[in-house]
Curated annotation (Swiss-Prot):
Subcellular location(s) of the protein: Cytoplasm
GO cellular component, one term: cytoplasm
Enzyme class: transferase
Catalysed reaction equations from the record: AMP + ATP = 2 ADP
Pathway terms, separated by semicolons: Purine metabolism; AMP biosynthesis via salvage pathway; AMP from ADP: step 1/1
Source species: Erythrobacter litoralis (strain HTCC2594)
A GO molecular-function descriptor: ATP binding
SUPFAM superfamilies: P-loop containing nucleoside triphosphate hydrolases (SSF52540)
GO biological process, alphabetically ordered: AMP salvage
Keyword Disulfide bond: no
Region of interest (LID), ranges: 126-163
Assembly and interaction partners: Monomer.
Protein name: Adenylate kinase
EC number: 2.7.4.3
Length: 214
């Protein structure tokens, strides 16, 4: 099973990708993570990418495709792939088809986690964590049992991510729509796109995705 998992920041894509890895033995292929790892390991494609980035240029589709190709080559044929952050353009979608065919694979599903923008703004802007143990809380949905005291470790220090503000969240939503707009119609024409309500509980979303993969 090879899938593309789509969803804006805050939709729970990272959490669900990890669930797929744990429950189905799949491999998450995040182009950003792979690029950083290749540069750090000084692989041939990593050195090529570093030279481009050192010039202040964007890494080309060809280099990203090389990364994907190398990862699939290293993977066992029975291990499914979760593509995260790729493809983002029609050209990349075409390249992915070629790469998958080379490895006797095909794309089975494109799953989009749908979110309500207003609810997503509320979810993200209200979240905060214990500065000591990292336990997550929310202004409206999950306050500590004792005000100002972490339920887990008893710390009284909390923190918020500086980019968890309404303006940034809405900008991210716009960027996400712009990035996915070119590729969704391609996969919709093939009948591969499935949509899951990303605003449900984590277990509910996981169950909905599992049902699509059966």
């Amino acid at each position: 099973m090879n899938i593309i998992l789509l969803g804006p920041p805050g939709a729970g894509k990272g959490t669900q990708s990890q669930r797929l890895v744990e429950r189905h033995g799949m491999r998450q292929l995040s182009t950003g993570d792979m690029l950083r790892a290749a540069v750090k390991a000084q692989t041939p494609v990593g050195l090529k990418a570093k030279a481009v980035m050192d010039r202040g240029e964007l890494v080309s589709d060809d280099i990203v495709s090389e990364l994907i190709d190398a990862e699939l080559t290293a993977m066992h044929g029975n291990v499914g792939a979760i593509f995260d952050g790729y493809p983002r353009t029609a050209a990349q979608a075409g390249q992915l088809d070629v790469i998958l065919a080379k490895h006797d694979r095909s794309l089975d599903k494109v799953i989009e986690l749908e979110v309500n923008e207003e609810a997503l703004v509320d979810r993200i802007t209200g979240r905060f964590t214990c500065a000591k143990c990292g336990t997550g809380y929310h202004d409206r949905h999950k306050q500590p049992a004792r005000e100002g005291v972490c339920d887990v470790c008893g710390s009284t220090e909390f923190k918020r991510r500086p980019d968890d503000n309404e303006e940034t969240v809405r900008t991210r939503m716009q960027e996400y729509r712009a990035k996915t707009a070119p590729i969704l119609p391609i996969y919709e024409e093939r009948g591969l796109v499935e949509r899951v309500d990303g605003m449900g509980g984590i277990d509910e979303v996981t169950a909905a995705i599992d049902a699509l993969l059966k």
